[in-house]
């Protein structure tokens, strides 16, 4: 019987994990090991993927992957241990403190002035970035979705200037399955930080401790931060920290990063272990008695075999031993074993497999989870089913229900756009426009009274106020849209959208995880492109990056709002929503084209942890909105201001630098006139339109500022309804801004960046031409 055949609500014991390569190793690292109990929670609304519970947490996987896992059904769970009944009064081991782990007389600190470097390592969605912000005072974005951090972030611990802490992408193990796992593993292995701060989600402790055990093998000073302890205690659970510290051999500090509780104590221990280079007391967690010590003997034999090679390669020997037993080719290549040693290694491993009755990877994973189970049985008072879990189950009955999930998603997105464009955002925009207009009148009167030079007067009023002011008025709409996107991500809903949409996205050749970068793309293409790093398949990553520009970013909102208010005032919300839908539809058609040509093959397997729903943090939402508002304002007073001044200058002077009365005689008209034949078939043959679209390559918001400067409010007399619609469609689809192209270049290289610019312009021209023909 396979996991695919197990009915909803039923439990079983895993007997065999099929498949091969990195995906199989990833399943084992996630706890899908022979002997583990698994329960089917539900199927996605479209029947695939499935959600299962294992080791106390929820995991999603496709039916095709579930078919590779053989099981034996059981009537009820048998290994759902309760842990200890109550926390014991165990003596504190005092690890990471002076006078206990070592004598004060024999302290040997690192030289004064040495930079103490730290790696902040933990599972995805365990609160790493929140802790990083508390440690450093930084304001990194925090979300409730696995994989928010997609690149390393560095900062200095507050109050300790000779420190540097690096927030690494969330990982489940030190196996190189995804690009973020490779980033984190390489940092620890190659850059050799002075210490590791391992953050563990105490509400999901068994899953998180798997990574802890691998980090202990790195032989680097380490402190374990038990995060979310406030939730554990709130659900009547507890952790015997002293016993856990003694069993792990490193300091263990209970904290709540969100509430800034226990962080100061964590810092003191982190500084101490790095300063005195206190490495883990224990690294040997294999049981000598387990299956006659088969795994124990294997690990120790391999340690002796590769010891000199590991030292030469600069890899911790215990870590190297378990990795080569698992079959990690990257580590094996670094060790450079000769033919005889390789043959001996394989002989040792095959003998262990024979005695243990499991293959090499499963045996090592089982050894780790076996120790974790013993550890938790002696140290953890199991909490009652958490309020967060109960609440999540109730919400999921609606938001991921078979018949309600898709309607709910559509309804939520429609509500978000309606509130943004017709209610909250529109009202705030009107308020800001009124303020800018009043200020413009006051400044105009002051400049006139002061008898300021006509050119300067024109620059300030017709250039800066008209251009930058018009763009600034769209700030409320952008902030409002980001507010709703932040609520969706912070609450944990976006992770459910990935689960619900996986089967649908698979039809166009993508994984459900690709929905996340695309949804982020509605905010800004730059972070959306970066978010693709969480995708484990290079094929999926490239395809998602190339499709992201079809998701209309907030920078285009000023263009839509400007033309809609002039040409379609009665149907504002409908036209704007229609543009978003059109972008998605064209993106879908292009995806089918990619699937059959450039990106043939199967999408990456869908393996993802579903976090509990959480109330969005007010501070986090405020932080995100401030960041987006600040970015927009910086752009408005840098790129857009410069673009506005340049456009004003070029359209105010001729080639001999004489001020012109008719802008048709200006430098700008001469240059932009070269492009007008290209845009004439779209009904956009005016040089001023071509100029504004060119300025949009620097920043999409500058399209509106350029139009305001060049037309001065008379654009309604120049364009027809059909040409305005064509311009909207062209703006929706043509090349992303220079910042987005730079991020694509960074991820895929110069060739792909150039291809994206040309390809998007071709698609935009064709779609705009068809739109003009249909309406005309």
Predicted regions span which residues?
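Conserved G1/Walker A P-loop phosphate-binding module
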Residues: 91-173
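Conserved C-terminal guanine-recognition region of P-loop GTPase G domains, centered on the G4
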Residues: 160, 185-252, 559, 566
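Canonical P-loop GTPase G-domain recognition
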Residues: 232-287
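Extended helical scaffolds that flank P-loop GTPase cores
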Residues: 249, 276, 283-450, 659-668
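Extended, low-charge hydrophobic alpha-helical regions
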Residues: 362-366, 382, 423-464, 508, ...
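Hydrophobic core segments of alpha-helical transmembrane domains in multi-pass membrane transport
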Residues: 408-419, 481-486, 564-566, 579-593, ...
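Juxtamembrane inter-helical linkers in multi-pass membrane proteins
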Residues: 438-442, 495-525, 600-624
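Transmembrane helix-loop junctions at the membrane interface of multipass transporters and ion channels
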Residues: 550, 554-577, 739-749, 768-776
């Amino acid at each position: 019987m396979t996991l695919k055949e197990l009915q909803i609500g039923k439990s079983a014991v895993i007997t065999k994990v099929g498949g091969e390569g990195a995906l199989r190793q990833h399943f084992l690292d996630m706890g899908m090991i022979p002997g583990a109990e698994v329960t089917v929670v539900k199927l996605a609304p479209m029947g695939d993927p499935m959600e299962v519970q294992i080791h106390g947490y929820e995991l999603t996987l496709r039916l095709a992957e579930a078919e590779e896992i053989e099981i034996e059904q059981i009537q009820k769970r048998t290994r759902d241990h309760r842990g200890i009944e109550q926390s014991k009064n165990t003596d504190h081991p005092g690890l990471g403190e002076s006078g206990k782990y070592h004598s004060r007389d024999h302290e040997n600190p690192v030289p004064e002035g040495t930079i103490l470097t730290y790696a902040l390592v933990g599972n995805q969605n365990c609160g790493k970035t929140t802790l990083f912000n508390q440690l450093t005072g930084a304001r990194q974005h925090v979300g409730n979705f696995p994989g928010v951090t997609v690149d390393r972030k560095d900062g200095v611990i507050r109050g300790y200037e000779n420190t540097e802490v690096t927030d690494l992408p969330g990982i489940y193990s030190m196996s190189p399955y995804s690009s973020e796992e490779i980033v984190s593993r390489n940092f620890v292995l190659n850059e050799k930080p002075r210490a590791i701060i391992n953050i563990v989600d105490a509400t999901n402790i068994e899953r998180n401790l798997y990574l802890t055990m691998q980090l202990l093998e790195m032989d680097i000073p380490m402190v374990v931060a038990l995060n979310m302890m406030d939730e554990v205690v709130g659900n009547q659970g507890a952790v015997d920290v002293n016993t856990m510290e003694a069993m792990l051999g490193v300091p263990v500090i209970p904290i709540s990063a969100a509430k800034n509780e226990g962080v100061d104590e964590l810092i003191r221990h982190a500084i101490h272990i790095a300063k005195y280079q206190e490495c883990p007391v224990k690294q040997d967690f294999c049981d000598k008695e387990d299956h006659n010590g088969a795994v124990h003997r294997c690990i120790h034999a391999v340690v002796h075999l590769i010891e000199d090679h590991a030292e030469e390669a600069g890899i911790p020997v215990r870590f190297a031993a378990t990795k080569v037993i698992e079959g990690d080719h990257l580590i094996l290549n670094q060790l450079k074993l000769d033919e005889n040693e390789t043959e001996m290694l394989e002989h040792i491993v095959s003998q262990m497999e024979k005695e243990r009755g499991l293959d090499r990877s499963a045996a090592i994973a089982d050894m780790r989870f076996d120790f974790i189970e013993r550890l938790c049985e002696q140290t953890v008072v199991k909490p009652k089913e958490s309020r967060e879990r109960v609440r999540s189950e109730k919400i999921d009955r609606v938001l991921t229900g078979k018949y309600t999930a898709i309607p709910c998603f559509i309804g939520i997105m429609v509500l978000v756009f309606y509130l943004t464009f017709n209610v909250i955002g529109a009202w705030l925009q009107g308020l800001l426009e009124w303020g800018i207009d009043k200020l413009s009148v006051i400044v105009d009167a002051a400049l006139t009274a002061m008898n300021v030079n006509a050119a300067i007067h024109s620059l300030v009023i017709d250039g800066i106020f008209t251009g930058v002011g018009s763009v600034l008025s769209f700030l409320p709409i952008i902030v409002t849209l980001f507010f709703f996107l932040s609520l969706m991500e912070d609450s944990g809903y976006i992770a459910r959208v990935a689960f619900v949409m996986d089967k649908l996205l698979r039809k166009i050749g993508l994984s459900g995880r690709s929905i996340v970068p695309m949804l982020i793309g509605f905010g800004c293409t730059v972070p959306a492109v970066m978010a693709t790093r969480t995708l484990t398949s290079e094929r999926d990553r490239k395809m998602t990056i190339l499709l992201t520009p079809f998701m209309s970013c907030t920078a285009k909102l000023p263009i839509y709002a400007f033309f809609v208010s002039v040409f379609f005032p009665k149907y504002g919300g409908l036209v704007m929503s229609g543009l978003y839908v059109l972008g998605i539809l064209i993106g879908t058609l292009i995806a089918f084209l990619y699937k059959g040509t450039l990106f043939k093959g199967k999408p990456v397997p869908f393996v993802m942890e579903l976090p509990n729903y959480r109330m969005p943090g007010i501070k986090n939402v405020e932080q995100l909105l401030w960041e987006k508002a600040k970015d927009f304002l910086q752009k408005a007073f840098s790129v857009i201001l410069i673009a506005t001044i340049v456009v004003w200058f070029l359209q105010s002077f001729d080639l001999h630098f004489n001020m012109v009365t008719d802008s048709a005689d200006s430098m700008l008209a001469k240059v932009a006139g070269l492009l007008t034949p290209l845009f004439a078939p779209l009904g956009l043959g005016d040089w001023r339109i071509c100029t504004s679209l060119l300025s949009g390559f620097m920043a999409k918001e500058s399209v509106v500022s350029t139009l305001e400067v060049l037309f001065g409010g008379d654009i309604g007399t120049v364009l027809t309804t059909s040409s305005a619609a064509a311009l909207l469609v062209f703006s929706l689809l043509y090349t992303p801004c220079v910042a987005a192209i730079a991020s694509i270049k960074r991820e895929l290289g110069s060739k792909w960046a150039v291809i994206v610019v040309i390809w998007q312009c071709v698609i935009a021209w064709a779609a705009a031409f068809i739109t003009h023909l249909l309406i005309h």
